[in-house]
Amino acid sequence: MEMASAFTLNVRLDNIAIITIDVPDEKMNTLKAEFASQVRAIIKQLRENKELRGVVFISAKPDNFIAGADINMIGNCKTAQEAEALARQGQQLMAEIHALPIPVIAAIHGACLGGGLELALACHGRVCTDDPKTVLGLPEVQLGLLPGSGGTQRLPRLIGVSTALEMILTGKQLRAKQALKLGLVDDVVPHSILLEAAVELAKKDRPSSRPLPVRERILAGPLGRALLFKMVGKKTEHKTQGNYPATERILEVVETGLAQGTSSGYDAEARAFGELAMTPQSQALRSIFFASTDVKKDPGSDAPPAPLNSVGILGGGLMGAGIAYVTACKAGLPVRIKDINPQGINHALKYSWDQLEGKVRRRHLKASERDKQLALISGTTDYRGFAHRDLIIEAVFENLELKQQMVAEVEQNCAAHTIFASNTSSLPIGDIAAHAARPEQVIGLHFFSPVEKMPLVEIIPHAGTSAQTIATTVKLAKKQGKTPIVVRDKAGFYVNRILAPYINEAIRMLTEGERVEHIDAALVKFGFPVGPIQLLDEVGIDTGTKIIPVLEAAYGERFSAPANVVSSILNDDRKGRKNGRGFYLYGQKGRKSKKQVDPAIYPLIGAQGQGRLSAPQVAERCVMLMLNEAVRCVDEQVIRSVRDGDIGAVFGIGFPPFLGGPFRYIDSLGAGEVVAIMQRLATQYGSRFTPCERLVEMGARGESFWKTTATDLQ
């Protein structure tokens, strides 16, 4: 049976050809290799019809133009040559579209990303809708790749090299008005008239490219270009620490095209695409993409979720305020905040106002839309307005008796079906539910700070939590724009449990004489966004270390912090950034204030600050403990799969994405090699480095956690 075409051609009475993009049985349009023959057949018809005045590409999907190329195509390539051939095929197809003798216009609504934007760039003009769903970008770098169908060559010539480099190197997505301002699109119109606006543009002569700004014209010249690439290269190297080869190749390919012409540029682009597709970094980043997509489809349990019409929040502090914001502004649900102090409510409301007002100032949101979203948030000092809330999120202090009291109050003041979700980071959910009348409706919902930025949430059912409660909580997390993983109700859950030994080891190295900045720089070089000491300062030393005694009580002395160090720091009123002094000293509030290591920290903890370890040795000690604990979490079924473990570490604590997560990283090293490293460290530094039984067994058998493909587990 012949496959239904993703591209269909209709010619209007006014001799404008409409090519409709609609990949059968898929929510999103993605480009696949087999579509090339369909497009070529249409191009042949267009060339044969001498009456045609113009062509319009438009999507039949409600919220996307083309979301990119199908990433599975890259995974199917076994060699760099195969991936290079894939890129050349894409380049050739785009060249054939561009070579049509009549105006070709892309009518864009929704996501126009990757190969989708490359197709739009091959057209002679572009019109997009003013809808918030409309975004344009080249995100290939986030998969360890570069645009392979001409994007590195066409974009700099259209909008200027410095602007194009920013887009390609970061994967930054532009909204409609930004795209218009930069000259990426020719017009922005309401969705209702998108097709007609594109048709009118197609009836005119080919749109002439607008002159580039003076700055971009200077940077396109030999001297300006040399200066630009030197500056951008330095900045990129500092940001990536040399861990992402795609950024270096992007700079090389764009510069080749500008210096030697498009023919050389296309050749360099295809070659680089093929080579990058085979790098371990790209394979790891693609595995994270597939795993996160998979997690987002996971309902959490087999039971159907209950309806979610409104949410309540207990506590208007920083976490409560952030949760209220994502519930109202991302999930679109009415949310009511209860705080015993009216100031807490005001703080929470102001938090959402500040977030939304920032979007209005950046022209990402209309003022009317801001007001509409703010209207979803209300506050109270008692339980008025809570009677029919479907789910209550508790975000009060980490105190077991207080949280148990909250459960009792919710059961007394809310409906029989109301779910109680605790945002605890350390207390067992089973203990919180111990005196509940409806324990099956009590669950953990652990957000990470800052709530609006951190993508992960841990969902923690206790032994008595119902399947429907799990499914409903997962459903809410997804509506809030989060990536949820379901974890077992054991001390520290997953993320904090693997993070604690990593931070403990950093503190231990401080006491041995390593300097704060050396430890942090070593882990940033390894690939973490910030070092462990800075992370502790950012989270708050008091908050971040509160879980250590809980973990030590549950799992023994491998979780013990160096004696008296934490208490010495806290007794000196050092809480980190929030009170201006921790391991670092912070200037006055404001973006320009720089932190610096406080030299007084060394005598305070009885250290000299004259270490002897190299950066790789520092990173090895911290990371190996994290890997060992992650394997224990699989063994104890704290996480349901290594997929969840990799996603939890990357999205929850910034484990280097280019390594694919703890389990991908163990596989890349080999379990046997990890065991050997840990045994060496155990001999040098003590029994906390003893590899767990599961790792030793896997090393002996030569086993791995993942199969060779990006999506399958062993």
From Swiss-Prot:
Location of region: 3-hydroxyacyl-CoA dehydrogenase: 306-714
Region (Enoyl-CoA hydratase): 1-190
Enzyme Commission number(s) from the entry: 4.2.1.17, 5.1.2.3, 1.1.1.35
Main location: cytoplasm
InterPro entries per UniProt: 3-OHacyl-CoA_DH_CS, 3-OHacyl-CoA_DH_NAD-bd, 3HC_DH_C, 6-PGluconate_DH-like_C_sf, ClpP/crotonase-like_dom_sf, Enoyl-CoA_hydra/iso, FA_oxidation_alpha_subunit, FadJ
Important for catalytic activity, annotated site positions: E118, E140
Keywords: Cytoplasm, Fatty acid metabolism, Isomerase, Lipid degradation, Lipid metabolism, Lyase, Multifunctional enzyme, NAD, Oxidoreductase
GO BP, one annotated term: fatty acid beta-oxidation
CDD domains xref list: crotonase-like
This protein's record includes keyword Cell membrane: no
Cellular localisation: Cytoplasm
Family: In the N-terminal section; belongs to the enoyl-CoA hydratase/isomerase family. In the central section; belongs to the 3-hydroxyacyl-CoA dehydrogenase family.
Molecular function terms from GO: 3-hydroxybutyryl-CoA epimerase activity; enoyl-CoA hydratase activity; long-chain-3-hydroxyacyl-CoA dehydrogenase activity; NAD+ binding
Gene for this chain: fadJ
Record's subunit section: Heterotetramer of two alpha chains (FadJ) and two beta chains (FadI).
Task performed by this protein: Catalyzes the formation of a hydroxyacyl-CoA by addition of water on enoyl-CoA. Also exhibits 3-hydroxyacyl-CoA epimerase and 3-hydroxyacyl-CoA dehydrogenase activities.
GO cellular component, one term: cytoplasm
Descriptive protein name: Fatty acid oxidation complex subunit alpha
Annotated pathway: Lipid metabolism; fatty acid beta-oxidation
Lineage: Bacteria, Pseudomonadati, Pseudomonadota, Gammaproteobacteria, Enterobacterales
Enzymatic reactions: a (3S)-3-hydroxyacyl-CoA = a (2E)-enoyl-CoA + H2O; a 4-saturated-(3S)-3-hydroxyacyl-CoA = a (3E)-enoyl-CoA + H2O; a (3S)-3-hydroxyacyl-CoA + NAD(+) = a 3-oxoacyl-CoA + NADH + H(+); (3S)-3-hydroxybutanoyl-CoA = (3R)-3-hydroxybutanoyl-CoA
Pfam families linked to this entry: 3HCDH, 3HCDH_N, ECH_1
